[in-house]
Swiss-Prot record:
The gene is rbfA. It holds the Pfam family RBFA. Monomer. Binds 30S ribosomal subunits, but not 50S ribosomal subunits or 70S ribosomes. GO terms for cellular component: cytosol. Keywords: Cytoplasm, Ribosome biogenesis. PROSITE patterns: RBFA. It is found in: Cytoplasm. Belongs to the RbfA family. Its main location: cytoplasm. This is Ribosome-binding factor A. GO terms for biological process: maturation of SSU-rRNA. GO terms for molecular function: ribosomal small subunit binding.
Length: 146
């Protein structure tokens, strides 16, 4: 009987993903991949998502200081089998070593966009108006309590 599919990852998937993220970060930090694009770039692994069968690991990476981030991600995908072999030593407890897929992490860009929106004059004006209302409400409550 097939299991019902859920949208949220299981506890095991989360635990394994975190172990894979640590092992992958250590491998990239040691600089074992011989590729000019990757050697000259610091690559941050922000998240790893595992497939339900734990055979595919999608790593979300942020190439820091790289001009062409897509080229760095493409180079990582090109060297995915090499990375898989290097990470396998740290993940000996796994029955199957996952296949690695690298994707560009856009969460930092989204954070910056939201931060810019929050700092915009329109939002600041609305927040100031809300602050004025709450101050007026507090002053009114203080007068009522006296």
């Amino acid at each position: 009987m097939p299991r019902p599919t859920t949208s949220s990852p299981s506890q095991r998937m989360l635990r394994v993903a975190e172990q894979v993220r640590h092992a992958l970060s250590e491998t990239l930090q040691r600089g074992e991949i011989i590729d000019p694009l990757i050697e000259n770039t610091v690559v941050s692994v922000s998240e790893v998502r595992m497939s339900p069968d734990l055979r595919v690991a999608t790593a979300f990476v942020s190439p820091l200081g790289a001009k062409d981030t897509d080229a760095v991600v493409e180079a990582l995908n090109k060297h995915a089998k090499f990375v898989r072999g290097r990470v396998s030593g740290a993940l000996r407890q796994m029955k199957f070593m996952p296949e690695f897929r690298f994707k560009l992490d856009t969460s930092f860009d989204n954070f910056a966009r939201i931060n810019d929106l929050l700092k915009s004059p329109e939002v600041a004006r609305d927040l100031d108006a809300d602050d004025d209302k709450t101050k007026d409400d507090r002053a009114k409550d203080d007068k009522d309590s006296e």
